[in-house]
C-alpha cells in the first residue's frame, strides 16, 4: 500500500509543487483570456457548462487573480465542487437553453 501512495505522490502531488500549472483549460483558452485582460486584477465572468473548478476550467486562472463570477452546470456534483472550492463565486445548478419550459 505504501508503494501505491508513493506512486500517487510522485505522479500527482509532487509535480504540482515544483511545476505549477500554467493553464487549467483544455486547450489553453484561459491563457488567451488572461493575456487579453492582463491589466485587470478584478473582474466578473459567466461560465456556462463550468464542469469542474480546476480541471478543464476556462475561469480558474481568472479566479486565482481575484476575479469572481457565475457558474452554471447541470451536474449537482460539479456545483457542489464549485461551492466548496470557489467561495467568491455564485454557482447554480441549471441548464441554459434557448427553449423555455421545464425538462423532464
Regions found by a protein language model. Give the residues of each.
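Phosphate/nucleotide-binding beta-alpha loop and adjacent structural elements of enzyme active sites
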Residues: 1-104
Amino acid at each position: 500500500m505504501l508503494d501505491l501512495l508513493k506512486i500517487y505522490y510522485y505522479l500527482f502531488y509532487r509535480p504540482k509543487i515544483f511545476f505549477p500549472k500554467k493553464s487549467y483549460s483544455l486547450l489553453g483558452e484561459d491563457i488567451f483570456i488572461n493575456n487579453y485582460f492582463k491589466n485587470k486584477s478584478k473582474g466578473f465572468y459567466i461560465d456556462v457548462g463550468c464542469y469542474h473548478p480546476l480541471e478543464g476550467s476556462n475561469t480558474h486562472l481568472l479566479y486565482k487573480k481575484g476575479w469572481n463570477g457565475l457558474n452554471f452546470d447541470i451536474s449537482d456534483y460539479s456545483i457542489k465542487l464549485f461551492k466548496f472550492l470557489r467561495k467568491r463565486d455564485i454557482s447554480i445548478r441549471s441548464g441554459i437553453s434557448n427553449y423555455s419550459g421545464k425538462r423532464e
